[in-house]
């Protein structure tokens, strides 16, 4: 049992450490003492209060979990809230924050559903706050220090003044209001630039970033209202591919939209427009993989890479989270095969959740899929969702068995597919040869 101290906060979000209790962590539904070492809180990470959640610590004498009740700090008495870390790009959560729902503090029948963040277990170590996470992509071009810079508003204003293309209006909101790094790159003219393409979707994901049902927390993004034309998309794509510096690519399929391949005809035309103007850079799509024929048509038009998202290789758990309309997991796997048949670079956007994704049978199914299809890269994406909401979906679904841990899951994936790239960011054309 480690010596990391329990963190808790008051109602204003001021964080304290407990003088006696040690930190507990969560894996699935289980709250326990951590069995792995944490890392110092990464640059760009933050500590966040979990409203309506009591902190859960470990009694250092008995080793048993303890729900923290009313505390006294100085002259102040209050009911504490649990604390979690939120991580910067390039990091993957390995454990969840331990907590207990506490409805009484809100005068209602239930605690509020938490906003959409990838809540990570945190504690206090000897040298400061720590988080239970692993550094899965060390490339520095997605650093928080190089985004949301002081000159960004001016860059956005200049672009909006010079073009009436409505894509720039959407990207300006993404860049400034929601701090989307991919959208910001389009204004910085570097690396991966964003091209939102679709306002509609053929899935109803429980953790959708751009459209949530009534009673859920507000979406972290607002979906593009008017789907852009092929000409509008082609214009933005061509300019970025021709003029950007660094690891240059454009990607269709962003957090501010639905499923891009539902507009595959327009995107295919946009790709051809861009390629008529420049041969530079990479053209990429982020997709749920629901439409294999549509994806194949995009590769025929000039697409060279895709990232297909999934939370599980188990059909029942996949369906329960994505709530697909008119397709299933078998179609997603077919899309993966299409990408490889067309010579594309295939990334799997794996939505990870400690205690579910790393269950023994879940891990085995994922490893078989990655090896069988020939996935080039797995991007480990910590699922941004209230942990209790996801467990309601996953508790009785998916593969069984004890969790092996996110770190071991990553190691097993690499063993199953020699040469597999593990990371968090899409690879540009020049980065793919060294698979």
Question: What is the role of each PLM region?
Answer:
Residues 192, 196, 212-269, 275-294, ...:
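Core AdoMet radical
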Residues 167-191:
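Short, charged low-complexity linear segments at domain edges
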Residues 264-280, 329-346, 398-423:
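Alpha-helix-loop-beta-strand connector modules within alpha/beta enzyme cores
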Residues 201, 205-208, 252:
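Short cysteine clusters
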Residues 293-300, 355-372:
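Catalytic cores of alpha/beta
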Residues 255-257, 288-290, 311-313, 351-353, ...:
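Active-site beta-loop-alpha junctions enriched in small/polar residues
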Residues 323-325, 335-362:
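Conserved strand-turn element in the central/C-terminal portion of the radical SAM core barrel
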Residues 1-160, 364-435:
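Auxiliary Fe-S-binding modules of radical SAM enzymes
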